[in-house]
Amino acid sequence: MCRIGSIKSKTPVPPSMALNLMLPQQEGHDNSGFAMVMQDLEGVFSHYKDKPLLSLACTPEGVQLVNDYMEERGFVQVAQWVPEVDKRPDLKINAMPRYVFRNYDYPEEYRTRSQKEREDLLLDTRLELRALLAEKQNGFVYSFWPDVLTLKEIGDPADIAVYFRLWNNDGRLTARNI
């Protein structure tokens, strides 16, 4: 069963605010997972709002495939956040080996192109990366867009929050829209 919550705030808030919306809805949860989209990011992403942010979960081989693909197409990585996960064995989560959130600079030839051309590039790139990782089950690309972070996982939402330390309000991961 799906539960939906949303927060839009004038000041940046941590994911725990959205997670608290789920607490009254826990009865009957089937452990099918948790998805979170954050927009208007602050914290570790505050200086990269105009840079496309790639959100992915993958194997080590998937990381290498993404690295090679992005380099071949002229994307330059400018920032990265890799969550420090809690790997307790009792957590009900179907975790991937790697979770990566990277900001990139556009390829040189796209830096002066129209907004529409850059948006088309990001959409096409996400779809190509998705197909590349799916080919040998090396992972999932959730989003590739400026100032948007997407995190998804299968399992108990409370355990997923513990795994990604989303209950910690350390200021590193905040947004105005969750």
What do these predicted ranges mean?
Residues 1-178:
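N-terminal segments that mediate ammonia production and transfer
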